[in-house]
Amino acid sequence: MGALQSAWGYAKDLDESLNNIRIVTGYSSDKMAEFADKANKAAKALNTTTTAYTDASLIYYQQGLSDAEVLERTNVTIKMANVAGKAAAEVSDQLTAIWNNFDDGSKSLEYYADVITALGAATASSTDEIAEGLEKFAAVAETVGLSYEYATAALATVTAETRQSADVVGTAFKTLFARLQDLELGETLDDGTTLGKYSAALNAVGINIKDTNGELKDMDQILDELGGKWENLSKDTQVALAQTVAGTRQYTQLVALMDNWSVF
């Protein structure tokens, strides 16, 4: 009886998932039958259930994506969900934040998941933790010119060094990078920091935050220049500079990143 109930429940969930896709897409019965067959085959190939596959597909159809885009994203999502041991719905939210903010079309969508998976295997943080941490600051990172490679490596480095969770570090990074974003808009931060003060602190150690055209440099370049000078600065200078750049609440994360620049 238990097996029968389980089978009935599975069939009911699958039917509901497929019906939701039909509602979102407006597909005909024949089109949905074709989709269900393809989903079943894809799910078997990815070692997951058809319902898990269709649930993930539904999320991407709700974003207004094409069949081809949904197929690619669903396959990547299921693969990463299997590695992370998480529900596809949760992983899809994380990957959507990453793709929407970092993907410029130059790399495959799977590349972004592969980077997280590799870092999860190489560090004390899990794939899921790194993805969750990235989700916290992906939007602001893209705005200030922090590349995906820098963002993921910085997150993994600071997480490993401080033993803080990727979620905590990701939230700290969001605040840290948002400072530069707010300053560029002409705001004065809560601690009294202005763009002039921020710029002067870095200028004092030989770093100009603007390029020859007067445009703000990408955060990748600013971090590169700071990392190259860090070990030659006194501890007092390091702390004072980190507090201006990152703020008094987040400066320890910046110090941890700079202290480990050689392995970053």
For the regions a language model picked out, list residue spans one by one.
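Short proline/glycine-enriched turn/loop segments at secondary-structure junctions
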Residues: E161-Q164, A242-Q243
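Hydrophobic, often aromatic-rich secondary-structure segments at membrane interfaces
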Residues: N203-K210, G214-F264
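Single-residue recognition of alpha-helix capping/boundary positions
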Residues: K31, E69-V70, T237, Q250
